[in-house]
Each structure stands twice: as structure tokens, then as C-alpha cells.
Amino acid sequence: MTAQIRPALVSDVPHLFRVRISVNENHLSVDQLAQMGITEEAVAGMIAASPCAWVAVVGDQPVGFSMIDMDEASLFAAFVLPTHQGRGLGRKLVLAAEEKLFECHEEIWLETGRETRAAGFYRSLGWGGQQDIGNVDIRLTKRRS
């Protein structure tokens, strides 16, 4: 079944959290996310305020999402259910987020783990300019082409 990429709706928020806590790499629980200020209410408020998230939908089920912080010029999140990884959904979600960010910014950034599959994935999409930000994390950047 083909996936559709569309802007996220407030009603998608519980599904976004289901996807977020399902991942194996960079796993965080709902409680850990809440300690960082990332709650369903906060994410719903962000989505209601401006177009800042996209979902990959298979059938009627969201199976992945990406989210940006436009003010910060950052790709805030990009996650796909483990059962749907390797199908190009992450690439499509990141490209949708990049397109929106590049409407207002010449350079965008994200943070991820240094030795993760995600870091390699982002590099394959043209992200670079690696900067060590401590612990095991790096910041990658991408310029509008």
C-alpha cells in the first residue's frame, strides 16, 4: 500500500507519540518526553499555530512524521515506525520539512546521535557540517541549493 505524505492535523498527535515511543534508536518514553516539555498538548499547540509537521499515512494510519521549529530553522523530529522503515518514508518526510524550512531560511540544522543510523541517513540526504555538541550528539546543517 502506498503512503501519503500530508500536513499533520491536531487529531494526529496521539499517533505521532505512538510513532515516537516505538522507535529503537533514540528511544524516549512519554515521561521522558514530558520532562523535556514535549507533551501532546504542546505538540498540538504547535500544529494548531502553524504548519510545522507532516505525517506519512498508510491506509488511514499515521506511520511516521517529521516536525520543524521554523523560528529556530531546525528539523525537530523525524521518525518512522520500525515496521515501516526502509520504504523511503523517512526521506519523504524530511524533504517535506526541508522544503518548508527553506522557504524562510538559507541554512537549517538538526541534532542527532553521532554513531547512529539516523546520522548516516541525514548525511545521505545532503546534511553535513558536523559539529560535536557534547555527549554523543552532533549538529548537522544543510544549505538551500
List each language-model region with its residue ranges.
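Residue-level recognition of the GNAT/N-acetyltransferase active site
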Residues: 81-85, 113
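A short helix-loop-beta-strand connector motif used in the catalytic cores of GNAT acetyltransferases and
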Residues: 44-55, 74
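Conserved active-site alpha-helix within GNAT-family acetyltransferase domains
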Residues: 91, 114-132
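Conserved beta-strand in the GNAT
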Residues: 55, 61-69, 74-79
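Conserved GNAT-fold acetyl-CoA-binding loop/helix
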Residues: 17-43
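A short beta-loop-alpha structural element at the N-terminal edge
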Residues: 4-18
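Conserved acetyl-CoA-binding loop-helix of GNAT-fold acetyltransferases
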Residues: 86-99, 124
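Conserved GNAT acetyl-CoA-binding A-motif
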Residues: 101-113
